[in-house]
Structures are given as structure tokens and as C-alpha cells.
């Protein structure tokens, strides 16, 4: 439910993807989430460890997905879907304000991500 996802973000939130791309504002973060949703199907998040302190939550997770859609590239080109399923590890750090995401940073090993989905040699 994209409305529910949108409402998780504060209007002025900042999101940073593993490649360092910064998304500013609710609409930009929702658009990024939708991009990932169209690129990968069968997302399954296994939260291995969650730690909270004050207004910050850190989530260590394993993510399994199948690459069924194109991966858009910064230059406007795209990588075709591989159809491969892969499990990778990621870490998300979330700062909250009034129950909404104020800042979100996601870290993952993109080299193993790209190799696992068959985008580059392993």
C-alpha cells in the first residue's frame, strides 16, 4: 500500500541509498521505494537484529528478492531484468520524528548485490 509507505515519511525527510544517492522529501523517497518495487519482486525482509536508542532505530537484515524489472541507471539507461533471485545483507538506520521517518540511511554490499542478480560477473 503506497499510501501507507508515503505516510511513514516526514514531509522533509532525507533518504540515502547504498550507492550514496540522496532523496529529499516525502515524494522523492516514495518514488525511490516505488522504483525498487518495480525492479524487484517477492521482496522478503528478515530482520536479523534491531536496536533502538532515543529516536534512532538500526535494523540489520537479510533481503531476498527476484529481479523482474529493469534497473534504471543515473544516465537514463537501464539494465534489463535478470530473473534471478538473490539474498543479500543490508543495514538501515532510521531517525524518527513524531512517528515518521526524518532520515533514513541504507547500507549494503552493492558488489555482491550486482553479482548475485547476474548484473556483473561474480
Spans of model-derived segments:
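C-terminal and inter-domain tail/linker signature
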Residues: 1-122
Amino acid at each position: 500500500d503506497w499510501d501507507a509507505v508515503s505516510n511513514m515519511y516526514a514531509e522533509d525527510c532525507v533518504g540515502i541509498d547504498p550507492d550514496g544517492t540522496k532523496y529529499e522529501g516525502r515524494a522523492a523517497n516514495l518514488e525511490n521505494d516505488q522504483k525498487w518495487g518495480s525492479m524487484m519482486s517477492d521482496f522478503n525482509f528478515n530482520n536479523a537484529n534491531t536496536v533502538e536508542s532515543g529516536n534512532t532505530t538500526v535494523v540489520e537484515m537479510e533481503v531476498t528478492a527476484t529481479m523482474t524489472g529493469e534497473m534504471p541507471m543515473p544516465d537514463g539507461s537501464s539494465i534489463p531484468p535478470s530473473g534471478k533471485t538473490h539474498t543479500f545483507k543490508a543495514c538501515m538506520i532510521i531517525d524518527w520524528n513524531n512517528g515518521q521517518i526524518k532520515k533514513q540511511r541504507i547500507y549494503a554490499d552493492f558488489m555482491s548485490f550486482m553479482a548475485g542478480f547476474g548484473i556483473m560477473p561474480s
